[in-house]
Amino acid sequence: MVKLRLKRCGRKQRAVYRIVAIDVRSRREGRDLRKVGFYDPIKNQTYLNVPAILYFLEKGAQPTGTVQDILKKAEVFKELGPNQTKFN
């Protein structure tokens, strides 16, 4: 199973995160399938590769809670069909 989750980057006390599609069994810093976005909580900047995110969501990828909140704020779920917006 594939999840969309945050991968920590940056230095101490200055964390930035990549939004990645990654296998559930992998560690947080493990090898990702594809980088699909970027999130900087300090500057409150977000970059999303929307076509790649939609591709993984259509294939059944599950976003984590934090990634789901980021995607809701960016209104990515409006581009999905109404029956595809339910996640565990």
Swiss-Prot record:
Disulfide linkages recorded for this protein, renumbered to the chain, are: none
Q: Which GO terms describe its cellular component?
A: chloroplast; ribonucleoprotein complex; ribosome
Protein's cellular compartments = Plastid, Chloroplast
Q: What GO biological process terms are annotated to this protein in UniProt? A: translation
From the UniProt record, which GO molecular function terms apply? structural constituent of ribosome
Record family assignment:
Belongs to the bacterial ribosomal protein bS16 family.
Name this protein carries in UniProt: Small ribosomal subunit protein bS16c
Where does this protein come from, organism-wise?
Helianthus annuus
